[in-house]
Amino acid sequence: MRWVTLGNGKVVTLVFDMHNEYGWKALKETGGTRGEVKGLRYLFGSQVAIFTLDPESSRTRQVPVDGSVVISLDQITVDDIAPLQDELRLHQTAVEAAHLVYTRYGKNWLEQLLAYGDAGDIKGLAEQIGANRESLAALYRKLKRVADLPFIVPSDQKPKKDIVETIMRYLQSGIHVVLEFGRQGSMLAYLLVANILARRIHEMYVRMTEEYLATMDPTKEPRQLVIVIEEAHKFLNPYAAKQTVFGTIAREMRKYYVSLLIIDQRPSGIDDEILSQIGTKIVAQLNDERDIQAVLTGVSNPAGLRSILASLDSKQQVLVLGHAVPMPVVVKVRDYDECCTTVSYELANYIPEVQDRIQEEEFEQLLYESDDGADGGARYEGGQSQIEERWREVFGEE
């Protein structure tokens, strides 16, 4: 993530932040004491935008947000329901019934289904579209949970500004986007929102790419987008991968300037075809035989790597293999606090706002001097609080 953020501006990221960890601050997990660690917006300021599904939660946590995400019922398609089958316990016949409703009512299919159900006339709808009444009734009961989510609104209440178009403007301006879920961090909300937004953004990228290829105008070339998703097996299991946009993106191999960065603790749940498309894998300690077999599929010398995976330090080491390295290599991962310190040190080199507004001499003085005149590491540590204070003066702390 840090590599992408500090890159040359040609790559942007969209992070679906289920647990509110990437954007502003998160709880410190190591060291034996409770505390906070800085998120991407805190570290990189205006290079990162935060959108939220839960404005109240963001205000409570004093998170500076750039916009709130609201989804209207007419923005939800039947394909967006496919990843929810396990969460909603939807039978395949109910999904087939949804397709019948969509055929009859188009983008208003969900609103019409809810209207008939609320009126107690599922039987009338079933007769009208030729669907099984029991399947349609089950579909109504399950999707009622979706309609009751706080960020879902009727079609006539959707905001005038399309939130997806707003996010796209940020991305095409070179600004990375973190979408935090606040207290709406249920798997149901995560699967639904990630699929809806990623599907629409992918559709826009397809149009932009086709326009660029037709004109070969350099100004129309889309920025490469990396979409970050957690719990990837929920989107990319053998069933969902064939129906969701994430399976499409994985199979297209960056054809439309969109790539996936997938995070998962159960790689064995991911479709084999999708696993074969992953260019670079960063693997922490694994003990489950199925998971080990999944990540090593198609890799030379799997037996040797198998023993390495089982012996990795669970919090300090990872195995990197694939396109990014000439051969599999074990890497010691730095603590996040150490990474934050390094980012503070590198701000003057990487962030234009700091280059423009904090002169190099001032930055050097802040970094290497402290009141007690200590040298070496002590001077470095002593200057950090001053750097952070100056950072807040530059970008503000809402």
What are these regions (language model features)?
Residues 1-15, 19-39, 43-248, 314, ...:
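P-loop NTPase motor domains
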Residues 55, 184, 232-233, 267, ...:
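Short, glycine-/Ser/Thr-/acidic-enriched flexible segments
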Residues 250-332:
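Conserved ATP-driven motor cores of ASCE-family P-loop NTPases powering translocation/secretion/packaging/pilus
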Residues 315-398:
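Conserved P-loop NTPase motor module
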Residues 29-32, 44-48, 83, 207-214, ...:
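Short C-terminal domain-edge/linker segments immediately following a structured domain
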Residues 194-198, 279, 299-300, 336:
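Short, solvent-exposed amphipathic alpha-helical segments in soluble enzyme
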Residues 135, 240-255, 368-376, 381:
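Long, charge-rich low-complexity segments
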Residues 7-9, 82-96, 118, 256-279, ...:
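Repeat-unit-sized solenoid/scaffold elements
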